[in-house]
């Protein structure tokens, strides 16, 4: 860890605009050739452009980046491509295998960062990675969303005229996975993950969370706001908030990148009289430990 933190990191923006153009290329093209084809099985994947933008802005080569719920390893892969070291944790064994294959693939493509990977419950991350306490420059992660925002289809054109089939939109049936918890359980578990991850931060390190509003039984839920409140209860203070575009930008207009099922759910909500819109961005929330801010006064 060759970079010594400075006071400026507490307010560092690295000249980022408030709206990040992270959807210029479709997600499929962002991953093509950089991740294994099997990675598409995961129901919720962070855009590689979001991960690389955050890592490039808030860390230096040689720094440590951690993702406590790493999925297919997007955060880790982008980190080691940018000459950062990475450590990740994933609950489901099958996804750990996907992450490991992606990391090996990254090294085969010339990535030089080192990595560590563990299979387990992210609520125990501070114990599993106790040797990393006080060393991470950045924790970058995202909570799981509902299955209505994820998945791929086989249309009637692909399956001989049959019905539209949805696949790759669910996690395993293991009830220990936070994706299966009610909203209160999800937030409680995510709060414990944030608290544990904060213990791994070096002084003035950053916790970054990507999150979007969701609908539960038709009701729009301000999940970003709830994550901010949850973080505050666990000693993390919101420092910055950005819009990371899922859509593209062309000639001052948005280019739709919405998935089939996001559009379908939006139409269904509108048919029920709900003023629903397809999501064009994720909130990127940056936090610092309250203790770091207090110590700087």
Q: What is each PLM-predicted segment?
A:
Residues 1-297:
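Class I S-adenosyl-L-methionine-dependent methyltransferase catalytic core
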């Amino acid at each position: 860890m060759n970079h010594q933190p400075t006071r400026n990191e507490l307010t560092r923006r690295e000249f980022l605009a408030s709206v990040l153009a992270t959807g210029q290329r479709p997600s499929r093209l962002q991953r093509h050739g950089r991740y294994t084809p099997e990675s598409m099985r995961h129901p919720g994947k962070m855009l590689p452009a979001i991960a690389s933008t955050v890592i490039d802005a808030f860390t230096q080569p040689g720094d440590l980046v951690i993702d406590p719920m790493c999925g297919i390893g997007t955060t880790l892969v982008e980190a080691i491509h940018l000459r950062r070291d990475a450590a990740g944790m994933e609950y489901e064994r099958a996804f750990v295998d996907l992450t490991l294959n992606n990391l090996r693939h990254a090294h085969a493509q010339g990535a030089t960062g080192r990595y560590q990977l563990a299979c387990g419950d992210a609520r125990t991350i501070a114990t599993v990675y106790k040797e990393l306490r006080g060393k991470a420059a950045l924790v970058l992660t995202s909570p799981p969303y509902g299955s209505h925002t994820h998945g791929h289809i086989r249309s009637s054109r692909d399956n001989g005229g049959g019905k539209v089939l949805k696949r790759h939109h669910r996690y395993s049936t293991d009830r220990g996975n936070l994706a299966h918890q009610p909203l209160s359980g999800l937030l409680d578990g995510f709060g414990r993950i944030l608290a544990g991850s904060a213990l791994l931060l070096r002084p003035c390190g950053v916790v970054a969370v990507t999150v979007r509003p969701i609908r539960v039984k038709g009701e729009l839920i301000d999940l970003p706001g709830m994550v901010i409140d949850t973080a505050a209860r666990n000693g993390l203070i919101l420092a910055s908030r950005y819009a990371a575009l899922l859509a593209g930008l062309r000639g001052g207009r948005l280019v739709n990148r919405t998935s089939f099922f996001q559009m379908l759910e939006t139409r269904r909500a509108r048919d029920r009289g709900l003023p629903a819109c397809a999501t064009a961005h994720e909130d990127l929330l940056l936090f610092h430990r309250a203790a770091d801010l207090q110590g700087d006064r």
